[in-house]
Amino acid sequence: MKAETPSFEAHQFVRVRRGDAVRRLIQRDKTPLAVLFMAAVVGTLAGLVGVAFEKSVNWVQNQRIGALAQVADHWYLVWPLAFILSALLAMVGYFLVRRFAPEAGGSGIPEIEGALEELRPVRWWRVLPVKFVGGMGTLGAGMVLGREGPMVQLGGNIGRMVLDVFRMRSPEARHTLLATGAASGLSAAFNAPLAGILFIIEEMRPQFRYNLISIKAVFTGVIMSSIVFRIFNGEAAIIEVGKLSNAPVNTLWLYLVLGMLFGCFGPLFNFLVLRTQDLFQRIHGGNIKKWVLIGGLIGGLCGLLGLMQPSAVGGGFNLIPIAAAGNFSVGLLLFIFIARVVTTLICFSSGAPGGIFAPMLALGTLLGTAFGMAAIPLFPAYHLDAGTFAIAGMGALLAASVRAPLTGIVLVLEMTDNYQLILPMIITCLGATLLAQFLGGKPLYSTILQRTLAKQEAEQAAKAQQAPRENT
């Protein structure tokens, strides 16, 4: 029996349904051009602010060092001047934060994570100037802080500023541009576009709403910020360590051991950061005068330490290539490592506007290089290069402390231009992350955010209890 042929109307119905399905698919994948345009604006502004922030900090540092050089031959002048200049610069940063924008203190990354969850406010009109000028003061004073945290917060606030200027009310656009600004800020700080993207996806994965619109916007913003950075600073790697040798397969187990070493140190480092924060809170008790004076004392001591041991202060970018080249002995590397652990804890935990990314990269380099130099005489047949362990160590502490191994791997490879070391980097960061997790360590930024939210809830509860008393 002959099968019945479908009618013309049936063919038309099927064709229409297919067309509707295709249109729905296209519509679902269609990113509003307005969002991409604003993402490009956010990325461009974040790149410009990043370049301006870097050059401003360098200018302040050069002015301070230049003033000290003028009296370098007179010890009775150079020591007091080193303390006074750094103390005054640091006090500017502490005062601005405490007086005008408390949320601008510290790294700023937990604030962006909280804002992505609508748990923390984004008051860009006061955070932008306070974080910029305050960061110039604390970083210019030579304190052990990095510019990446401020740049992430500045970028996120730029995203919210652009949103308000264009009067976008969509919750999705608000979230997307905030994430775009944060990624663009990190990219502009390190000249690491892929790391900026991965940082949002990996470190802020609980808060970031991953979809076709948001990821395209993040890509667009990061591209623009990277282009702006390279226009002003060139395309060379931000940390010049040269091309290092490959890691032979029979030496890879050493990188796992190194990763386990960082896996033990990472949770301890996080614990010390939190305890030091509590210590400073007990000392100043929220009093602005005590807080600023303590900040000035810390800044002044960093200025003095810079005269005695310059490698113990500053963000650490200048120290990394020197240490990775094997110019220090194992004993000196460990001494500088311990000194920088102490100064990093004091400077970051005091609430100064500045990040901890760069100091952690320097700490990882020091310990990684020391491990490599100690292993060379123990395994002469391996023909080891201490520099490869320095590169692996850079990302390992970041992986163990922040719990973002993929970001740590890509960030270090982009900054040093040593992509051939990706395998030992993966092994080291994986070992560090797994052991840190096994030991019960918590991600640093998430823990700081939880403490901030708990403090916020306590303050709100106190105000709620105080209101009825005032009315009676």
Curated annotation (Swiss-Prot):
Periplasmic compartment segments: 70-76, 233-252, 310-329, 377-386
Chain positions of site Mediates proton transfer from the protein to the inner aqueous phase: 203
Name of the featured protein: H(+)/Cl(-) exchange transporter ClcA
Segments carrying motif Selectivity filter part_2: 146-150
Motif (Selectivity filter part_3): 355-359
Sequence similarity: Belongs to the chloride channel (TC 2.A.49) family. ClcA subfamily.
Protein location: Cell inner membrane
Organism name: Klebsiella pneumoniae subsp. pneumoniae (strain ATCC 700721 / MGH 78578)
NCBIfam families: PRK05277.1
Gene Ontology MF terms in the entry: antiporter activity; voltage-gated chloride channel activity
Alphabetical keyword list: Antiport, Cell inner membrane, Cell membrane, Chloride, Ion transport, Membrane, Transmembrane, Transmembrane helix, Transport
